[in-house]
């Protein structure tokens, strides 16, 4: 199985990813999140005003890990870079993630502006 095939298998429900970004002071910030793949990119969905989005706008480098939660474990560790972000379709993408991971509709909180962040993997390490 090719590395990208394993990324596609793991980067989606029910597997939760852990995204590492760099804070303004250089310290790491790690956040668990839901994710999906599209055209050899990894997409995450977040809200305007979050620490992770501010970090990504300042420094687009990321590290991401996802594991299958099995023993022996299958996992990927990915280094990549943000190649774009958009508000267009972000609410729909959020709905898709909620349905896939939780089986419910996204809460659509008042004033919450969603953003799709597109990550291009530069290095994929398959573990397991």
Residues of each region from the PLM?
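A short, polar/proline- and glycine-enriched secondary-structure boundary/capping micro-motif
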Residues: 53-59, 75, 103
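Short beta-strand segments
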Residues: 14-48, 54, 62-66, 77
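A short beta-turn/loop motif at secondary-structure boundaries
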Residues: 25-27, 68-72, 110-111
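A generic structural signal for nonpolar/aromatic side chains embedded in well-ordered alpha-helices
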Residues: 10-11, 56, 97, 119
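Structural motif corresponding to alpha-helix initiation and N-cap regions
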Residues: 4, 49-50
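Charged, gly/pro-rich active-site loop segments
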Residues: 1-2, 73-128
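Short, hydrophobic alpha-helical packing/hinge segments within bilobed ligand-binding/sensory domains
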Residues: 7, 52-53
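Extreme N-terminal tail/first-helix region
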Residues: 1-16, 72
């Amino acid at each position: 199985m090719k590395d990208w095939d394993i990324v596609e298998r793991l980067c989606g429900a029910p597997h939760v990813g852990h995204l590492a970004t760099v804070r303004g002071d250089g310290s790491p910030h790690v956040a668990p999140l839901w994710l999906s793949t599209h055209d050899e990119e990894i997409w995450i969905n977040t809200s305007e005003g979050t620490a992770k989005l501010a970090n990504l706008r300042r420094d687009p480098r990321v590290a991401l890990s996802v594991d299958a939660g099995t023993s022996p474990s299958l996992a990927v560790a990915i280094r990549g870079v943000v190649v774009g972000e958009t508000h267009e379709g972000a609410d729909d993408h959020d709905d898709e993630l909620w349905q896939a991971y939780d089986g419910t509709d996204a809460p659509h909180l008042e004033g919450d502006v969603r953003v799709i962040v597109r990550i291009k993997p530069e290095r994929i390490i398959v573990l397991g």
